[in-house]
């Protein structure tokens, strides 16, 4: 027997990922077909240093204007001078905030009414109650500007669970700016 005082260094230990009640139980094919839907895009030169970010928001509501179904937030990073509209292309999730990537997401359930996220993340409501939510830690989004001025957004993201689940889908339509 003996004793040791000092640090213990552990290499290659598995990362402990907390299990949450709002984690997806299986892959989610997202749909955007609610009675009331708001699809918008907002730009910012303040989110990332020396870059311009575009956040796409897909928000769905029931007849009483309460959240319903799938809600999605995607944030891409463009050059600082690309402020007129989002630049079409394929954006891979990254935590680097480099131009040409999609921002990795965060999501905290204990903040705000139904939690709060940054970057790329989703929420799913069932009968007005938050059922599932999570942040994108991997995957990609393709942004296409169509000849008629509409956009097609095709995405396949993985959440940050121990056994990651996909949240994916496609949407085509007009994007509005809130201002």
Cite the ranges covered by each PLM segment.
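Residues at beta-strand starts and edge strands
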Residues: 2, 50-52, 70, 149-151, ...
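Edge beta-strand at a domain terminus
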Residues: 2-34, 76-80, 137-139, 156-179
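Long, contiguous N-terminal structural blocks used for assembly/anchoring
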Residues: 17-50, 55-57
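Short, solvent-exposed loop/turn segments that connect beta-strands within catalytic domains
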Residues: 65-67, 148, 162
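A short, structured loop/turn motif at beta-sheet edges
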Residues: 143-151, 179
